[in-house]
Curated annotation (Swiss-Prot):
Reaction equation(s) it catalyzes: O-succinyl-L-homoserine + L-cysteine = L,L-cystathionine + succinate + H(+)
Record function comment: Catalyzes the formation of L-cystathionine from O-succinyl-L-homoserine (OSHS) and L-cysteine, via a gamma-replacement reaction. In the absence of thiol, catalyzes gamma-elimination to form 2-oxobutanoate, succinate and ammonia.
Transmembrane intervals: none
Subcellular location(s) per record: Cytoplasm
One Pfam family linked to the record: Cys_Met_Meta_PP
Main localisation: cytoplasm
MF GO annotations: cystathionine gamma-lyase activity; cystathionine gamma-synthase activity; pyridoxal phosphate binding
Family: Belongs to the trans-sulfuration enzymes family.
Name assigned to this protein: Cystathionine gamma-synthase
InterPro entries, per database record: Cys/Met-Metab_PyrdxlP-dep_enz, Cys_met_metab_PP, PyrdxlP-dep_Trfase, PyrdxlP-dep_Trfase_major, PyrdxlP-dep_Trfase_small
Cellular component terms (Gene Ontology): cytoplasm
Gene: metB
Modified residues (N6-(pyridoxal phosphate)lysine): K195
EC number: 2.5.1.48
């Protein structure tokens, strides 16, 4: 089954009891049991809910996993995944990793005895050099947030397996429509379902899947034990969003490429970060391991001090957190999504105060270009 069709018919797409073509919202916290210890598959909605289960089956199907897991947020899912590790374990993280992931690790998980080394994961030599005897996992974002770096998933997974490491991939930017890390050797894939999968800026969710049965059992335990599960209403909204993921991603990518080409030629722009541009250093790798380039891009102005005035002059591009909705969003990572990362560390990774990140929506491309042009005109 091709991906476009799988988005609609994958997982559990219908209700077997009634024939409803949309999975019902099972808005219940508990379930009648036939006898002590005898139930019909569900006993308490933290442990399992039919609406959530349908979503979990769907993400596993889309990513090539054996089991999926739905959480109350992307970070709740990442927390559950990192719970697989033990005190004393060491993890490799990307140097421009999402600020929320950085904060979770460096302010929460360190208290549980975990440690990490920050590296440029798009450079395989840095990964090899950073591996220690107690390194247990390699955590990747590709494309990365916000510099859109591309990491060679197959190569990294091979190195990780040689050293007995788990390869964990945040696939939020690419989505299963454009990239499937499990098929390239990764062990676990995580998503912020809030973003492209939901696609309408109306749900907060996290999804995780794995192609390893033993890992699936452990993640299932932590999902239930920690309890950060996704509710049935949000599970249903996310399933509805996923049905149109293919159409939306094609539109996002078309507009993003148009915007990236416009910015690359603009005299006020210093550099554009978009893997769909031939000038991107990992363009060929992106073409090899992805089926498309998504709708995220970042750029720097020649004058960093103009960045704030520029984004505040935009009208169609909404100044706000998050990404992946049908509407275009703009932000300055240094002051927003990555503000929790120390300034010296941010700048060393290339996240300057003047770096602007765009989540390009599905509006008419000419309207987006005109909005950018009028903002440039306002800053002179």
């Amino acid at each position: 089954m091709r991906m476009q069709t799988k988005l609609i018919h994958g997982g559990i797409s219908e209700d077997a009891t009634t024939g409803a073509v949309s999975v019902p919202i099972y808005q219940t916290s508990t379930y009648r049991q036939d006898a002590i210890g005898r139930h019909k598959g569900y006993e308490y909605s933290r442990s399992g809910n039919p609406t959530r289960f349908a979503l979990e089956e769907l993400i596993a199907d889309l990513e090539g996993g054996v089991k999926g897991f739905a959480f109350a947020s992307g970070l709740a899912g990442i927390h559950a995944v990192f719970s697989l590790l033990q005190s004393g374990d060491h993890v490799l993280l990307g140097d421009d990793v999402y600020g929320g992931t950085f904060r979770l690790f460096n302010q929460v998980l360190v208290k549980n005895g975990l440690s990490c080394t920050i590296i440029d994961t798009s450079d395989i030599s840095q990964i090899k050099k950073a591996i220690k005897p107690n390194t247990k996992a390699l955590y990747l974002e590709t494309p990365s947030n916000p510099l859109l770096k591309i990491t060679d998933l197959a190569q990294c997974a091979s190195v990780a397996k040689d050293h007995g490491l788990l390869t964990i991939v945040d696939n939020t930017f690419a989505t299963p429509y454009y990239q499937n890390p499990l098929l390239l050797g990764a062990d676990i894939v995580a998503h912020s379902g809030t973003k492209y999968l939901g696609g309408h800026s109306d749900v907060v969710a996290g999804l995780v899947t794995t192609n390893n049965e033993a890992l699936a059992q452990e993640i299932a335990f932590f999902q239930n034990a920690i309890g950060g599960v996704l509710g049935p209403q949000d599970s249903w909204l996310l399933q509805r969003g996923i049905k149109t993921l293919g159409l939306r991603m094609e539109a996002h990518q078309k507009n993003a490429l148009c915007v990236a080409e416009f910015l690359e030629k603009h005299p006020k722009v210093e550099r554009v970060y978009y893997p769909g541009l031939p000038t991107h250093p990992n363009y060929e790798l992106a073409k090899k391991q992805m089926r498309g380039f998504s709708g995220m891009l970042s750029f720097t102005l020649k004058n960093d001090s103009e960045a704030v005035a520029f984004v505040e002059s935009l009208k169609l591009f909404i100044l706000g957190e998050s990404l992946g909705g049908v509407e275009s969003l703009v932000g300055i990572p240094a002051f927003m999504t990555h503000a929790c990362i120390p300034k010296t560390q941010r700048e060393a990774a290339g996240i300057r105060d003047g770096l602007v990140r765009l989540s390009v929506g599905i509006e008419h491309e000419q309207d987006l270009l005109e909005d950018l042009e009028q903002a440039f005109a306002k800053i002179g």
